[in-house]
Amino acid sequence: MLVTFTEAAATASTSSLISFSLSSPPKFHHKSRIYGCKATFGLRTKPTSWIAAASLSSSTTTTSSCGSSVFDPLGIEQDNSWGVASAWDGVLKFVSQTFESSSGTRKDRSSSARGVAAAIEDSSIDFGDFFKGPLPGKFLTLLGLLALSRLGIYVPLGGVNREAFVGNLDQNSFISTLDSFSGGGIGRLGICSLGIVPFINAQIVFQLLSQVYPKLQDLQKKEGEAGRKKIKQYTQYASVGFALVQAIGQVLFLRPYVNDYSTEWVLSSVILLTLGSVFTTYLGERISDLKLGNGTSLLIFTNIISYLPASFGRTVAEAYQEGNYTGLAIIVVSFVSLVFGIVYVQEAERKIPMNYASRYSGKSGGLQKSAYLPFKVNSAGVMPIIFSTSSLSLPATLARFTGLDILKKAAVALTPGGSFYLPTNILLIAFFNYYYTFLQLDPDDVSEQLKRQGASIPLVRPGKSTAAYIKTVLSRISVLGSGFLAILAAGPAVVEQATHLTAFRGFAGTSVLILVGCATDTARKVQAELISQKYKNIEFYDLEK
């Protein structure tokens, strides 16, 4: 719309002024206030002469601001109470300036506080900061709970020939691995020998069911923290059932080694083993409440650490008896190299840069440094190895109950050292790793979450294109993760064949992966706790100062 501004001359010697009234120009005199336009409209007049320019610059009342705040270009609304309006505008101007000054001060303090927070994150953490907060008390409570979890392992079941059972235990790689997870509880036949394994099995089952059963999937994703608490409660109930089934299976497995296999012994043993597993699961939940790491992982970490000296001692004794010092040196070097390799791969990640609609840093004016989407190289963890080991032990378990010759031959071929053990194990690990990677990270779900947050990948359209791009990245990462897990699973078998030492069989690469992963996770939690202690001293929005 084109608006034409006409000039109305007040006197012959004064400047020309803009008037928005097209019907009748107002009359001016030397004491009246001029109702024109504010400078914020960007409208300027051009004087007709240098005398008019001088007159315009000397008149402070005409060039400061307009008296009326109503934009009325057609002159429909006339305001005769110019004095009250001028006073009211003056009050509003003063109040607005006051609040703008207050807002500017708050922004300055907020930016300075964020600067202090960034300096805290970048600064190194002193060892003395550990004793300034609640961390010492939390660690003492953690050590007490872990020690309490170990007591049940040293309370054995009665009436079992332990020497004969331990001799057969070394020949079964799967049970040896479970024995390392329980900290030697299976070998000692303790009442807490099942440990946290039934709870882990229940978690695996519910993770698989959440992808098949839509109600569980909605409960996990759409209901937030309340839904996750319900799933956790269902998992705890299911772990009791798994503990009962595994206790019955362990009692049946112990039948050849029991002196008096009676109904009373079976019932009492099943009840004790089930209660021991429930007690261990309860301790794991209390450990998780300390927020120093996952309680399940810390329990397994403690059991593996306690199993390590005995396993290494048996390996050293076997090497000295056979005079195989070269094999012992190879095992030590392989173990150290394995630890460093696991640390490197666990910390490796694929970073996809992200663009956010409104996430900019205050100082530089550009995107924040953390504007990327990280994907771990080994996002599936140890679950593919556990699934593969369980699958390889299935023929031996079925052959024990059925007695079929074909199952016995398959069990011999799929045991460590068998002809089909390595290729079958690697293929199963690759399959389960690919499946479990996409079970944890759904590309469509990730794409939808990025779209809701206003984030996008550069040169990739939001929606289906983003989901396809993420799927391609995860597929390539799963190949690297499968190769890494295959080395972990097949490495101990290769070292065993090269050194001819079997005492270290139960302590596989899976155990080292759990140790390293749990240690790094706990270190991150402690560092986050120390940083949060320093954040408590920062006042981000303090208006009184």
Curated annotation (Swiss-Prot):
It is a multi-pass membrane protein. The keyword Transmembrane helix applies. InterPro entries: SecY (IPR026593), SecY/SEC61-alpha (IPR002208), SecY_CS (IPR030659), SecY_dom_sf (IPR023201). Coiled coil: none annotated. Its main location: plastid. One of its GO terms (molecular function) is protein transmembrane transporter activity. One of its GO terms (cellular component) is chloroplast thylakoid membrane. SUPFAM superfamilies: Preprotein translocase SecY subunit. It comes from the Eukaryota. Keywords: Chloroplast, Membrane, Plastid, Protein transport, Thylakoid, Transit peptide, Translocation, Transmembrane, Transmembrane helix, Transport. GO terms for biological process: SRP-dependent cotranslational protein targeting to membrane, translocation. It is found in: Plastid, Chloroplast thylakoid membrane. The chain crosses the membrane at residues 139-159, 189-209, 234-254, 264-284, 292-312, 325-345, 379-399, 412-432, 477-497, 500-520. Pfam families: SecY. HAMAP family: SecY (MF_01465). Belongs to the SecY/SEC61-alpha family. The central subunit of the protein translocation channel SecYE. Consists of two halves formed by TMs 1-5 and 6-10. These two domains form a lateral gate at the front which open onto the bilayer between TMs 2 and 7, and are clamped together by SecE at the back. The channel is closed by both a pore ring composed of hydrophobic SecY resides and a short helix (helix 2A) on the extracellular side of the membrane which forms a plug. Component of the plastid Sec protein translocase complex, which is composed of at least SECY and SECE. NCBIfam families: 3a0501s007. This is Preprotein translocase subunit SECY, chloroplastic. It comes from Spinacia oleracea. The gene is SECY.
